[in-house]
Amino acid sequence: MHRRPSLFKACVFLFAASAAAMGVAQAADSKLDSVLARGKLIVGTGSTNAPWHFQGADGKLQGFDIDIGHMIAKGLFNDPTKVEYVVQSSDARIPNLLTDKVDISCQFITVTASRAQQVAFTLPYYREGVGLLLPANSKYKEIDDMKAAGDSLTVAVLQNVYAEELVHQALPKAKVDQYDSVDLMYQAVNSGRADAAATDQSSVKYLMVQNPGRYRSPAYAWSPQTYACAVKRGDQDWLNFVNTTLHEAMTGVEFPTYAASFKQWFGVDLPSPAIGFPVEFK
């Protein structure tokens, strides 16, 4: 005698079928699919912070963040120009992701645990820190010379509640002069009112690229922070794709593009990734 399938078995079957259908729907709803269907990538970024994102003489956005956007577009469409940049304030970097105004934010976003509760961070593409800018003819050669100078050393810094504390992490006895703008800070170095300026290492390197032979920087930096792009949480396919693109830009087939951008904006020749055993597994 044949028995009818039990109600329990039927419910299990329906649940499994529903779960499978939901899985297919979720995969189809990935940002990766919608970006590919649209035919262009929409990147949130800034426009006033060289060498990361700023307007060139032709009015077009340029900088390292902009180049990162082009690299992701190339990964998507094999065409780095298929990208639209939405200029946004720093405060809008996360809200614009959450409201789907942009597909990704690449705007020198510092990775923090609290921000990671709101967005998903990609692989980091730069490690920032505080560096020192000195005139090329400075009597101070390295950080030890500057430490030995004690309070006879004057360091210019952009005005900030933590400015003095930050400088004293590296130069405990230095005199710290604070300025209202970056231009005034650099003028203090140029005029000799300050022996050095302490600012983002990326800014130090960029200024040296823009003014060959005028400045130099000791081989020392401190207060590290990580920069990454950010995407909306909950879309692993999209995050995986962006991470794959960035990974191959920094270690694989697209390394020449990443290295050329790094050289252009920071004046640094990156060593080629080691061939053989993947370095990320060491």
Predicted features, each with a name:
Residues 27-106, 117:
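Extracytoplasmic small-molecule ligand-binding "clamshell" domains
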